[in-house]
Amino acid sequence: MSIFIGGAWPYANGSLHLGHIASLLPGDILARYYRAKGENVLYVSGSDCNGTPIAIRAKQEGVTAKEIANKYHEEFQRCFRDLGFTYDCYTRTDSEHHHETVQKVFLRLLEEGYIYKKTVEQAYCKTCTQFLPDRYVEGICPHCHEAARGDQCDACSAILDPLDLLEKTCKLCGSTPSVEETEHFYFALHTFQQQIKKVVEIAKEKGTWRDNAIQLTERYVKEGLQDRVVSRDLPIGVPIPVKGYEDKKIYVWIEAVAGYYSASKYWAEETGKDDHEFWNSDAQTYYVHGKDNIPFHSIIWPAVLLGIGEEAIPRHIVSNEYLTVEKRKLSTSKNWAVWVPDILERYNPDSIRYFLTVNAPENRDTDFSWREFIYSHNSELLGAYGNFVNRTLKFIEKYYDGIVPQGTINVELKDKVEGLYKNVGEAIEQTTFKVALETIFDAVRFANKYFDERQPWKEREDNPVSCEETIYNCIYLIANFANLLEPFLPFSSERVRSTLSIVNRNWEPQNTLPNRIDSVQPLFERIDVKQIEHEIEKLYGAAK
């Protein structure tokens, strides 16, 4: 089976925060799981280096957009690597390959009659002497009356045109823009009304899209899909490949989602492999992003794929809700965020991955609390999982000189482990990652109870053979926990595998166990709870 996983492309205009990771982490869990199952996986993403936010930040800082994009693209790569993300291809939208691929998509849509020219009115800033596309305009959303950008309202997820906004201002200088005529290209989205309606009906029937994606897409379909502008007067981006219009750029909402396609093609060129199997109707496709990106993946991207004749319509949409911070809405402008480069300096990446999975905003907004983060590490990772691994391995090191005693696998434990692979695998495939991880940790708590009830420290004196059986079965559980937890906690799983000399990484029970163990070290260190107050003070102190 061919599995295509696309992670949303973060704007390269500022550091990643935990809200980004909360929405993107499911992609890596899926990729690791399907690879362990032996499936053919292509997991792609990249940095959005063409967006309006980058141009705005560059102008504000007096540097080039390329300098801003380079800085954050490199930082993103480091952060994703340090968090254990396993992209098969992580690229950027300002690459020559991406530009060429997107231009081919644009021309194909133009040739098929899905793109047309139209004279329209657009916001124009007389102070800055330029037309103002999407995010260059700010104001009030006409639907919910919250503050919004010219492309979208984060409060109600409405897709907007800058002229829709009330109380419009220029993002660059703050003046009120005028309205002038200009010519642009439009995407005939209305022609895909019935096809998109069918796509969402199937997703609803099969339960393969998150509820928020189904509800929002149904709303747009019910209102009637509206044609969308696909060109903009921007300083950076992919030039329109039509003579006389080279100064205009392809609008980021169509260009960025086409990044999945360009990354796939780039991967194929670099590896010499064929990517066609990821774009046919048999492919299982997963698109992983936050709820603010839903319409781009549930309406626009399917329509583009239909327009260019590709069959791999988004099968699964994994659209998480928002992550708040200490009960307040995350805000980059107010510096109310937990920044990824910062948290990685002090905390175990598996601790971050664990918390953002068990506390994931899968169906509702959830909160990142420093207190809950540190207590979850100490009680679950250290107190439950780390404790079971450490007490078992230390027992072997102390009483058996590192030689794993031999025995037979308990039938009840074997059935439990086999059931875990089935149940956890199903939960991952159904994108209920919190359920999957909690299921494993229920088994970890069962394992600690098993150790306590068997009392090997007493068995060693009273019944040495029974003690060997107990420890052998504990090693069996540890080996399988490392396997089951690898999609979620890759770093600690690798350490356990190394200690047990386990090579097999398949998604199946580990029945061949090691003869000896080496270099037993604690899997996790306790975090001083005094850090809670320190981190909260730091957060409030940095807020604007």
Curated annotation (Swiss-Prot):
EC number in record: 6.1.1.10
Stored PROSITE patterns: AA_TRNA_LIGASE_I (PS00178)
Keywords: Aminoacyl-tRNA synthetase, ATP-binding, Cytoplasm, Ligase, Metal-binding, Nucleotide-binding, Protein biosynthesis, Zinc
Keyword Cytoplasm: yes
Reaction catalyzed: tRNA(Met) + L-methionine + ATP = L-methionyl-tRNA(Met) + AMP + diphosphate
Cross-referenced InterPro entries: aa-tRNA-synth_I_CS, Anticodon_Met, M/V/L/I-tRNA-synth_anticd-bd, Met-tRNA_ligase_1, Met-tRNA_synth, Methionyl/Leucyl_tRNA_Synth, MetRS_core, MetRS_Zn
Required cofactor(s): Zn(2+)
Residue window of motif 'KMSKS' region: 329-333
Pfam families: Anticodon_1 (PF08264), tRNA-synt_1g (PF09334)
Coiled coil: none
Any single biological process term in GO: methionyl-tRNA aminoacylation
Binding site for Zn(2+): 141, 144, 153, 156
GO cellular component terms, A-Z: cytosol
Cofactor note: Binds 1 zinc ion per subunit.
UniProt: ATP binding residues: 332
Taxonomic superkingdom: Bacteria
Motif position, 'HIGH' region: 10-20
Subcellular location: Cytoplasm
Assembly mode: Monomer.
Family of the protein in this entry: Belongs to the class-I aminoacyl-tRNA synthetase family. MetG type 1 subfamily.
Reported function: Is required not only for elongation of protein synthesis but also for the initiation of all mRNA translation through initiator tRNA(fMet) aminoacylation.
Protein name (database record): Methionine--tRNA ligase
Native source organism of the sequence: Bacillus cereus (strain G9842)
Gene (UniProt): metG
